Amino acid sequence: MKDVQRIALLFDFYGPLLTERQQELIRAYYLEDHSLAEIADADGVSRQAVHELIRRSEAALQEYEQRLGFVAEHQRRLRLLDELQEALDRADLSAARRALAALRAEA
C-alpha cells in the first residue's frame, strides 16, 4: 500500500485521536494534496515546522495502529470476505464455509 493511502486509511480510523492541529495538517497535506509551502504560507509558519508536525502526526497514527491494530484487523476481514466471495463464485462451498467460519469466529 502506498504511503499516502496508508496514512489516509490510518487517518480514517485514528484521526479523531489526533489534536485538531494535527488533523488539519494531515487533511491538508494528504487528503487535499496541498504542498508544505502552501500550508506554511497559509499558517504563517515555516515549511520545516509544517513538515515536522506532519511527521509527528504520522508517527502518532502509526503508534495508534501498532497498539490497537484496527486497520490490520479491518484489512484481514476484507481479505476473508474476498475469499468468501471467490469461493461462492466458484461454487466451492467447503472453502466458503471455512471463510465464513473464520469471520464468525471474530464475532
Swiss-Prot record:
It comes from the Bacteria. Coiled coil: none annotated. Pfam families: UPF0122. InterPro entries: RNA_pol_sigma_r3/r4-like (IPR013324), UPF0122 (IPR007394), UPF0122_fam_protein (IPR054831), WH-like_DNA-bd_sf (IPR036388). Belongs to the UPF0122 family. Might take part in the signal recognition particle (SRP) pathway. This is inferred from the conservation of its genetic proximity to ftsY/ffh. May be a regulatory protein. HAMAP family: UPF0122. This is UPF0122 protein STH1464. The lineage of its organism: Bacteria, Bacillati, Bacillota, Clostridia, Eubacteriales.
